[in-house]
Amino acid sequence: MSTGTYPYKMFKMDVTNLNKVEDVEIERLRAERELLRRQKEAAKNSSTNGSVNIEGTQDSNDLQYNAHLFKSSNPKEEYDSAIDVRNDISQDEDDYKRTNDVNDSYRLVRQYEAPKELLNEYADESYDPMQERQSKKQIQDRESDYQKQRYDRQLTPTRVDAFQPDGTQSNGRSYAEVMRQVELEKEERRVHMELNQRRREGTLKEVEEEESISDKKRELELNNTEISQKPKRSRWDQAPPSVTQVSTTKRRSRWDKAPENFTISEHVIENGISEDLINKEVNVVEEKLRPPVRLLTEEELNELLPSEGYAILEPPPGYLESIHPELLQKGTTLDTYHVPQEQELPLEKELPAALPTEIPGVGDLAFFKQEDVKYFGKLLKVEDEAKLTIAELRERKILRLLLKVKNGTPPMRKSALRQLTDQARDFGAAALFNQILPLLMERTLEDQERHLLVKVIDRILYKLDDLVRPFTHKILVVIEPLLIDEDYYARAEGREIISNLAKASGLAHMIATMRPDIDHVDEYVRNTTARAFSVVASALGVPALLPFLKAVCRSKKSWQARHTGVRIIQQIALLLGCSILPHLKNLVDCIGHGLEDEQQKVRIMTALSLSALAEAATPYGIEAFDSVLKPLWSGVQRHRGKSLAAFLKATGFIIPLMEPEYASHFTRRIMKILLREFNSPDEEMKKIVLKVVSQCASTDGVTPEYLRTDVLPEFFHCFWSRRMASDRRSYKQVVETTVVLAQQVGSRQIVERVVNNFKDESEPYRKMTAETVDKVIGSLGVSEIDERLEELLLDGVLFAFQEQSVEEKVILTCFSTVVNALGTRCKPYLPQIVSTILYRLNNKSANVREQAADLVSSITIVLKACGEEALMRKLGVVLYEYLGEEYPEVLGSILGAIKAIVSVVGMSSMQPPIRDLLPRLTPILRNRHEKVQENTIDLVGKIADRGSEYVSAREWMRICFELIDMLKAHKKSIRRAAVNTFGYISKAIGPQDVLATLLNNLKVQERQNRVCTTVAIAIVAETCMPFTVVPALMADYRTPEMNVQNGVLKSLAFMFEYIGEQARDYVYAITPLLADALMDRDAVHRQTAASVIKHLSLGCVGLGVEDAMIHLLNILWPNILEESPHVINAVREGIDGIRNCIGVGPIMAYLVQGLFHPSRKVRNTYWTSYNSAYVQSADAMVPYYPHVDDDQFNNYDMKTLHICI
């Protein structure tokens, strides 16, 4: 131990002795410790100065200080000789720890806390592995490197609209200029590749050496003509020496000119946008705000420094300035502090320290991010709009609306989106797209923001129509990446935008715009362009695009063009599906020659496109593929690797289209190649081989004997292995292929080969076996399974079920499928199965207990069929004892098992008795877990339906109170089960008490609870007859409370919907109530009353209550001019219901009055109802058309229509 440090040593002591130490003793110890610390410091200083060893003094002080704390005569015996580095140090061994105070003193009071193991356990439980994924909301965080190539594309300059009706052309690049630019890029790429190739080969070195030699000679000649001068290193604070140089003609560079009034919008209009353009405007502003370098004046120094206590000193003689004056005159920029001038202060105020959420002219936003400053920074500046030009005002208005859409609240977004849509043509296409498209190219964009901006483009495309033509390519650059997004809804949005764009621009303009990208040097651009062309074909029709596709696929200029053309046809097949059948022959002819193309990529893509066409056309269209069968077969024999995989895939999709004899012939020929490729090390090849085998095996021409002798042995040898089971995709394909083979050769051939795998030590292998057996036996049954195989099967499944350690339910599903398929044949094995279930119900693992309970639910029917009611009663008693389970998932499974046993055994034979079981279920209803709630309510409903007499009415009422809370559950199935259970209970104990409980529930504030209560009341009315409910509802309607009255009306609506024709008996009783509701000031009242009338009238069609319906129609009709969409829809439905009840004639008398009203809104309302009547009752309306007198020119009266047969 070093002499200059305090000896921190761990020692043992008794806690009781420490608790008995008096305060005085503690103070004495503190004083001694302080004295010891001072001695240590003095010793340290002396050892530093004179290197004196004071170890003996230190030990004596330790002995004097610690003597009363140890029972041993030698205190060092109690010391630990080493620091324990274990994680599980006990509390007694860790009594005293060093604190962080200055004195480095010991703690005098024990510190108690939970063990580290327990703390670590809770820490692990709180860890959420998906939290990092959820926090990454930006799109670029989940994109692959291939998808991120979209940031490398540029928004090209605006292109000329060659299809303007007036014949004039707008400013922009023509098609010829675009093609020249594309050719220039190709040539540049070719030169770079050639240079790299020569550099690798070493042929470029000699040219470089010759150039370097000539450069050196030129330098020597220049040096001879100039005055020899020793070079001197330049300093930043010295002016460069003046050297007279010969004026030479210098080429003017565009970088010599400083940008003026540079904005993103103007640059986008002229030259497009690149990745660095986003920050360019900000850099220009910073360049303008950067102050010139100058010396501080006396006034500025007086402001910075205090005036008192300071004196201005004269420079000493010989002082030289560190910054040369000539450098200052040249305006060199140095990072020095400066005092802002008055004209600079407003510019600094424009950049706020914190990001605001309330923007002038926009309002209070939901959020405002740092990235938004790049695009919406102009809105942060408060400017006088009277001094702005019309274009600047339009730009600021568009920015405000876009900011509302992007960052605003839902009402704000809705209003801004409507304004952008309505004023799209007023704003103009250039002003809109030059602000929207750069936003969509932002790297930090999130899914919700992109969705909203894409919605803006979708809306304004309808309004702009052909005005979008100059911006077609820009829109495609932004939208095409959506077509390869992993999100399905993003792909759907992209297809919708491109479809609308194609309809607005026209096919000719779309082809002219996308033609340069077909043979682009970048594969990413070609891929997205092909997908966009497929969307254009689906929008404008495949026949319109076929001539262009035929020319592209036969291009001799570029193999990239042929490759892209074939890919377009592949994407058309994937997008349109069976809709390609009318054009199948032409599409196959377009790409058929590609199977023999000189480029391998074109051949592969052609084969893949043919497979997509065949898959889309299944099971028709074999005639269209006649021309490609021979090239396909020769390619299968000739190619290897990826090319062979593509050709095999195409052949596999075409064979099922053939006639049985041809399919059998081709299958036998291709199966030899497939068997050879079974041993291929390539994973993709194996997947394709499996798919082709399943397709060939499912054809009609292939015999089971051929598959059994030639295919199955090699198939199981190569594919049924542990390595294949560990790969999820291969595992799934192997299972599907095995099931297809089983359907041809029978279940026994497959089960015999895989049954021994149930006892394999690899769990993924056992799981693959279980899934295969489950699907094979589930589809083919066990009629081919003999007794020995049956024994092996049950033994293997039971072993796999006992040995499983994963939470998946594959083996459980297989177990239940096998047991239910065997039926009574598995009776000898039931005691062993039940004993296994009972043993696993007592397992410490919650997952094991849950699966054991689920297995009980699935085999109860077999237990009943085998007559093992004693086993079921035993299981019921055991499960009843486990109703105190703490894990909700396990408890839900136990309740499901009890429900299955109750359904099979019956109420009278159930053990435990129903009178003991139901009271245990009442407190479980309070459990908020969805699985527990659903199974509990279903069980209670079964008991109420079949065994209500075993339980007292008081217990049923207690359950009713608990069920009321279930009416507001989030899951729909739980709410439905609760409502049905109310009907069973009301049927069991009478509707009075249940109805009173439900009517009281109408007074709560929660709307969902009230709606579910109204449905429950309707169920009670349907179960116990309406006359038991209608008087109570009509009496409760008198309650002067809005929620209660609305609830009563809604209950009547549901009730009349349920009871149908029984409503005829209550029409006249309920009419005054409905008349009062239709004349209420509350719109919701009138809406709900109109719904009641709809259901009431539809239930009384042809039952002779037309007078009451006409009375209700007279009160309902004035509401036809309501503006609320919900109210007007309910009113129209009520009118349609009355029309079906009383006929279309009286309704026509009402409708004719407003069909030709001067007001457009009135006409629209009446014509909507007229169109609905015309759709349903066109023939019945003819006699009720208004009579129009003839005039001198026209005869409106047709005599034949007056004839009634």
From Swiss-Prot:
Polar residues composition-biased segments: 44-58
GO cellular component, one term: catalytic step 2 spliceosome
Main location: nucleus
Bias-annotated ranges (Basic and acidic residues): 130-153
InterPro entries assigned: ARM-like (IPR011989), ARM-type_fold (IPR016024), PP2A/SF3B1-like_HEAT (IPR054573), SF3b_su1 (IPR015016), SF3b_su1-like (IPR038737)
GO MF term list: mRNA binding
Subcellular compartments: Nucleus
Chain segments annotated as transmembrane: none
HEAT repeats: 393-429, 431-473, 475-505, 506-540, 541-578, 582-619, 665-702, 745-782, 828-865, 912-949, 954-991, 993-1024, 1025-1061, 1065-1102, 1107-1142, 1143-1179
Keywords: mRNA processing, mRNA splicing, Nucleus, Repeat, Spliceosome
SUPFAM superfamilies (alphabetical): ARM repeat (SSF48371)
Disordered: region residues: 39-58, 122-175, 202-254
One BP annotation, GO: spliceosomal complex assembly
PANTHER family: SPLICING FACTOR 3B, SUBUNIT 1-RELATED
Function field: Contacts pre-mRNA on both sides of the branch site early in spliceosome assembly.
Record family assignment: Belongs to the SF3B1 family.
Subunit structure: Belongs to the 40S cdc5-associated complex (or cwf complex), a spliceosome sub-complex reminiscent of a late-stage spliceosome composed of the U2, U5 and U6 snRNAs and at least brr2, cdc5, cwf2/prp3, cwf3/syf1, cwf4/syf3, cwf5/ecm2, spp42/cwf6, cwf7/spf27, cwf8, cwf9, cwf10, cwf11, cwf12, prp45/cwf13, cwf14, cwf15, cwf16, cwf17, cwf18, cwf19, cwf20, cwf21, cwf22, cwf23, cwf24, cwf25, cwf26, cyp7/cwf27, cwf28, cwf29/ist3, lea1, msl1, prp5/cwf1, prp10, prp12/sap130, prp17, prp22, sap61, sap62, sap114, sap145, slu7, smb1, smd1, smd3, smf1, smg1 and syf2.
Name the record gives this protein: U2 snRNP component prp10
Protein source organism: Schizosaccharomyces pombe (strain 972 / ATCC 24843) (Fission yeast)
